[in-house]
Amino acid sequence: YSFKYEDLINGLLLDGASLPTVDSELNIGDFWTLRFASTTSQGNVNFNARTAKVSVGTRFAGLYSVIEHDYWRIGVQRSDVEWPDEMVVESVDAITYRVVEYFGAFDNNEYYFQIDSNDRITYPALTPSGDPQVGNNEPMTNCDSNLTDLTNVPCGDLSNLVIRDEVNGKDQLVMTFGYYTVEGASGAREFYQVLEKIVD
């Protein structure tokens, strides 16, 4: 299914006013939630149970394949842990991104990162709503703030960077982060992943 911006705004009002005629006047992070309906030959309308989200994004928003990964649990490499094949990265604003669903290999999570003008990746201490960043409900760690908790995965110049692909658009996000469990099996969980943008 394909559409243009004009299709999305046709007949749509927001607070009684039409949306801008050009998408450049929208804010990064603005979105539509599309609900699909089909009409039978008898005229019955049936709605699909699933929806699709269309958002105003930036270059690095999109669907990524996981092309490399490494996970260490309390100093022990865990190559047996399955990672997802793909991850969704959403734009929050011009420099902030949200990874939907996964924190490394673990689902039912989300986290935020930022890309600066030098294509370096950092992880803000707080989410856009002001809550502390967590992974699996534990404090998030990163190379800048918790280097001693990330000794088995790359930090420094070899990680937390963007590799731009100006020819094919298959940009890569090279990321190192983790979380620290305080109670129970306490200790660092360390993640390294390389995500490559999927281009149609």
What is each PLM-predicted segment?
Residues 4, 39-41, 180:
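Solvent-exposed residues in well-ordered beta-strands and their adjoining turns
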Residues 56-200:
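Ser/Thr/Gly/Pro-rich, low-complexity flexible regions
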